[in-house]
C-alpha cells in the first residue's frame, strides 16, 4: 500500500456519510487493543472556533515541553493535516503503516465504520505510537454520539461557541444543541465553556451539577483589545497583560479566553505550564484558512466561514481590517447551506462576487449562486473553474483591492493551489 492507496481506502467508505453512534468505533478500537485508553485528552466540541481553540491549546502545551497530538477536521489543504504531533503532520510512511495496521480490523467488522470513525482509529493508534503526553481532540460533529466520544474522562472537556448548524442531527434550538455537545462531559471531570446565552449556560450548569463536574466559564469580561492590524492583535485577559495573537478578529480573543480557561484547569490538575509557555504558545499559534492572508499583491485572504456565526465574524473583520478597500469576494457554497441568509450581511461590503463551484458532491453550481446573488441586487459573475475564478478575482481587485475567499471550507485547498500556480 502506498499513501494514495491508503487515502483511497480511507475515503472508500465516504458513501456512508455521518451515522451518529459509538458502537462501531468502540468495536474497531477494541479489536485494535484500545489505544485511546492509553492516552490523555483535551476534548473540544462546539459549532465555531473548535479548530482555532485546538490550535492555540496545542501550541501552548508544545511550548510547555509536552509531546502533543492534534486531531482536527476537516482538512484544508491535505489529508495529513488532520493528525499532527508538535505541529508536524503525519508523514506518508506513517499514514501507510498505521492504515495497514487498522485495515484488517475494520474489514473484519460486520457493519463497516464510517470514514470519520476509521480516521479516529488511525489517529488514536498514531498518537499512541508517537508517545503523546496529551492529545488535543476536536469533535467531528455534535458531542454525545460523535466517534471521538469513545474516550474516557479527558483532562478537560471544552465547548466553544454554539450556533445553529447540523440541526437535522443535533437539534433545532441552541439549548438542544448545547445538550448534545455537553455529551462529552464525563462524570467527575473538568469542563471549560465559551460564554453563551442564559439558556445555553443553564444547560451546561445542569449537566455539570448532575455529573459532579467542575465547570469553568471563559473570562470574557476581562478581555481588552490593545491593538490590532493585519499582522495580529495584542490583548489583555484579566491579570494576563499584553498577550500577542496572530489570529485575526475579535472572535479569536474570545476563543483565546477559552484557551486560558483550559490552561488554568490543566495547571490546577498538575500540568507544568507557566505564564511564559502561555504567552509564547499564543504568539506562535498558526491556524490556516481563518481570515488567513495567503497573498499580498493583491491582498488575498482565505476564510473558511460557512455558517451565520462565521459570516458575522467575517463581516466584523472586513469592517475592522479592510475599510475603504475594494473587496472582491471569491465564493462557492454547498447547496444544503442557508446561503440566502449567509450572503446578505456581506453584500454591502463587497463590490463584486466571483462565484465558483466547490469540489464536493453537495455543491451548489456557480451559475446558480451567481443568479441568486444577482436577483437580490449584488453584482456577480460565474466561473467555469476555480482557476478561472482566481484569475478573474485578481483581475477585478487590481493592485489596491482585496480578494476575499469564503463560503466553504471545501474550496480553500483548490483556491490556494490555483493561486500558487498563478
Regions found by a protein language model. Give the residues of each.
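Beta-strand->loop->alpha-helix junctions that form or flank phosphate-binding loops
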Residues: 194-195, 207-229, 246-250, 278-284, ...
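C-terminal helical cap/extension that packs against the catalytic core
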Residues: 197-216, 231, 299-300, 308, ...
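Positively charged, low-complexity intrinsically disordered leader regions
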Residues: 1-40, 168
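ATP-dependent carboxylate-amine ligase catalytic core
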Residues: 22, 26-30, 34-37, 63-152, ...
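Nucleotide phosphate-binding/pyrophosphate-handling subdomain across enzymes
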Residues: 37-38, 134-137, 145-158, 162-166, ...
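A conserved segment at the C-terminal end of the G1
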Residues: 44, 52-69
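Extended acidic/charged loop-beta regions that coordinate divalent cations
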Residues: 119-169, 201-242
